Structures are given as C-alpha cells and as structure tokens.
C-alpha cells in the first residue's frame, strides 16, 4: 500500500470510528456491531503502526491507552473551578431564590435544574475542535493533567463537530453496573474493592497507566461551557444545547423552571427516581439560566451567587452488628459478611453487609456487638461505613479471621499482591457447591428449577460432585428430596436434558474459568466454534483475539491443561452435551421470516450475553428497526440490567417488554 493510500485510509477509519463512538456513547444508538467496530479499530492500529508519520493525537486508537506516566503534571485553570454553595432542605432553596431576586431588578428569573452527578469534576480544552488537554478540578485553582486517561473515555470527543476553541467542564463517572462488575472482579482476585462508584471513577482516572483507565468503562456528562472564542451564548440551557451539537454527552434529564416551586417539584421528583438511574447522583444543581443575570449576580470567593447544589439526605442508618459469618466463593476467596439487626436502607430491608476482607475489619476496627452506620454503595450494595465508638460498652468482641477454611479446614493462604484469604484446595466442598450454582445459573446453562436450594440438597445427599454428575440425575433421586413431587421432578429432569442443547458459550461461562465472563465466553465460542478447537489453542493464539488479554489467555490455557478438566469434557460428550457454537451469525439472518420484521425495537440496559450493538445489527438483519427512545410507535423494549427510565416509558405507552433471555430465545428460533 502506498503512503498516499495509507494516509487516506487512516483518515477514513478515524472518521468512521469517531462517528461510531458518538452514536454508541453519546446518542446511545449504535449503528454497527462490536465485531465491525473492532475490525476497523484493529485495521487503524495496524496502519498507524506501519505509518507512524501519520499518527495523530486525536486518533480513536488513543482510546485503548497510551504510555505509562511517571507523574501527573500540574495545570493552572484559566478561570477557577469554583465549588457550589449547598442547600439541604426546601427552606434553603427558598432562601437562595430570595437572594437571587434581591440581587437583581428583574423579578422574572428562570432557573435550570440538572442532576448532580457523583463523580470527578474535570475540565476539557479544545483548540480548533481538537481535544488538547484535560485536567482534574484539584483545589479549584490548580489541577492535574490527566489528558491521556481522559482520551480513553469514549463519551469524550477527541474532535468536535466544529473547529471551535473552548473549555468545557463536566463530571467523569463510573456507571453502577461497571462498578459492581469491577468490584466482583477485584474481590475474586483477592484485591481491595472500591467503596463506591465515585471512588472507583476517581481511582481509575488517576491511574498513571492509561490502559487501566481504558478498561474501567468510565463515562462523562459535560455540564458547562467555561469559555468559547468568538461566540456569545445568552443562556446556560442554550450552551448545553450547543455542547450537544458539538458532540459532547450532556445529561438529558435537565429542566428549565420558571419558579422556585417548579424547582422544588423537580428536586422531589428526582429524589424518587434516583435509584433507577445507572449512575450515582447526590443532589440537584440549580442555576440561573440567563447569563447576563449570572454576571450581574457575580461570585463570592468560593462560589457563584447564581447557583446552588441541593444535597440529597444521606441514605445512612444505624444498626447493630450481631455477628460475622464467612462464605467461600467458587474461586476459593473467603469473604466475611456482617450479620445485622434488620434495618431499612434505601427502600429495602438489609440483614447482611459484605466486609470484603480482614484488612477492612481491622481498618475500621469492627467488633461483634458494635453499633454501625450502614448504607448502600451505589444505591445497590449494603456496606458498613463506620463504627459508632461512643456506643461501645466494653462487651464487644474483637474478630479474628480463621487460619483454616471454614468448609474443608484446609490452611488458608494469602497469595502475592492479594488482600483476601483464599482456600486453594480443589476438592473444597464450598467451592464445588458454589461452582455448581454458577454452572446452572441464568447466564450459564440456565437450568430452570435448579437453584441454590436444590443444588445444596443434591450436594448434601452426595448425588452431585461435578458438573457432569447433573446429567446422571434420575427422577427417583429427586423424589427423595424435600419439596419434590412427581411433576416437579419430571420437569427438572427434562430441564437438565434440554440444557444439553445449549450453545457452546453457555457451557464455557458455566465452567467458571477464572477471568472469563459471559462476553468473553461468547467471543471464544464464536471464534473457535467447538470446544475441541478451543482446548488446542495456545496462549499466543488466544491473545490475537480482540479484547483477550494476557491474563485471560493464561487462565484459559492453564484451565484446559488439566487432566481432571479433560476428563470432565469427555464425560460431557458421553452424556450428549453440545460443545459447539450454535449462535447466530449476521450472514445467516438474511431472508429469514422473523418476529422482528417491520417492528420498532428499543434496547436499554446492559445485555450480558450479547452487546447492544450486536443485538441491533441482528434485529436489523431480520427486518426490524432499532431506535434510541420509547414512543407510541415502539413495538418492543428489550431490557437488560439497570434498564432505567425507559422501562417506565414503556409501561406508559403499553409497550411489550422482554428480558435478555426472552430476546435470545426469539433470535435462536
């Protein structure tokens, strides 16, 4: 390929990938599959490596993470990043309104209300449309240069839709589902977990290695325009519209309010809706919309007089910690859990809260009998915030982690660079039981009627010890168990039989190979098509697959380099368990009669087995249309985890709602 052709192709790929990023991460309406995006990205990376003279600082390839830094350089903000004054109740809001009206002659003041994202405030500098620098807020005067890490956030445009010079400000955050997934991975790996999504976002964005930030699935909402050359915008609401037109992601839930009564109604509305968002908010920001009035009101040394932050009441309660129980996960990690006197937190009754590891118990000086403050991290996971030391009587008991596994009494170990204690006995009954529960779960073999309770009964009766044992179960054995009758036993035997027909990716995920989640299992299944081919793969072969890193490749090779595992696979074959990929390929979908033909479909939330862009591609290949919002013309909403407000919209318009499992069933017909 000549240099001229290479340069032209590089420019084409950059434009394409920038468009795809904008559609997916800002509009929430992807137009291509993950596979197509990955192919284009790999082609761009290859061409740039072969032609380094054409490398550009705003190339989408930068998003995978660049060179490891030694230190973050300091940056002085052109204008201070001021903090906001706080309001904690309705009276504080009315006082703010009164002060605003006292400061101006015009009695008509319009406010704009926005959700206060609980993340990390950053500034973004663009020169002639190109992203040149990003910095943390720091102390408001001086921040840190985190440009390389911000370039990994796909919601931040590297090039704007206009060649404009400006500074935008916003909040980088971690979605709740990403927070849960990250902590699960850290816990399985015996690492310290993050206390909440805000800490996770801040910790990720301040990594000296941008590749780590790139893996953390951060996002960002831009909430303001600090300055823009050669352009005057009369209101804050219009500046947000302008930022959206340039390609920034702005929060869609903002609202202009004509009176303080409207502001209070908005605050009350989002206090109720808050738990349904896939990101954390800790309040509402209220600003005077008119820029001329903002300038007239001015600022104090610390904060603007024309804006205030209403802070939601903390979702924290006090209860007594009555005990600490231990659980052994399928990877052998021993996790302490606080047993609590039942208490309502964020709308649900909480009886337990994870203590994660021994270091956390020591750090917080948690003792049995203590009164503790409890909240839900990310409005999801109950956690012990701190001990109320003033309530101690002297009768509280210090807790010491055991030296041996509570399930098998093998000695516990702490692996290098891990904070968790781990049982490394491969025959540990607790690990085997947890592995069996995972194997039959919804995203794995999906055996209806075979949940934790039944697995425990079968395990205790010594009917199952390996995954393959499930396929030798008889109706007679099931009838011996509590709560099993003729019909339920027959149904379960049939459900187990049906699971033999699952596609390869479900079996792979069910095996519980360390570091291999549902998405990676599907990637392996599509790539190799059969279990035999995957078993033969080398670490080098695995690492050539997009998004498969060294750690996962090593884990897969190690897993299959085990005689017991190979024996298990042989037993699966003898029982007739399918070990080939049966999923759909786009090319196979053309000219197929389908439910989706002529229908308008909306995808929302996180789809575990299939990414949304891939789902969109398959629906369109079957004659359907995928849109980004729910309306009267919508025929179907496919709702994954953390579906959010679109579920409520679907109910309002009487739109049919499917979960991911139902959606996959229809695709596989």
Swiss-Prot record:
One of the GO BP terms on file: DNA repair
PROSITE patterns: BRCT, DNA_LIGASE_N1, DNA_LIGASE_N2
Residues of the BRCT domain: 591-669
Active-site residues, record numbering mapped to chain: 116 (n6-amp-lysine intermediate)
Pfam families (alphabetical): BRCT, DNA_ligase_aden, DNA_ligase_OB, DNA_ligase_ZBD, HHH_2, HHH_5
Transmembrane regions listed in the UniProt entry: none
Keyword NAD recorded: yes
Positions of disulphide bridges: none
UniProt cross-references to CDD domains, sorted A to Z: BRCT_DNA_ligase_like, LIGANc
GO cellular component term, pick one: cytosol
A Gene Ontology molecular function term of the record: metal ion binding
NCBIfam families in the cross-refs: dnlj, PRK07956.1
Functional description taken from the UniProt entry: DNA ligase that catalyzes the formation of phosphodiester linkages between 5'-phosphoryl and 3'-hydroxyl groups in double-stranded DNA using NAD as a coenzyme and as the energy source for the reaction. It is essential for DNA replication and repair of damaged DNA.
Family: Belongs to the NAD-dependent DNA ligase family. LigA subfamily.
UniProt name for this protein: DNA ligase
Naturally occurring in which organism (per UniProt): Bacillus mycoides (strain KBAB4)
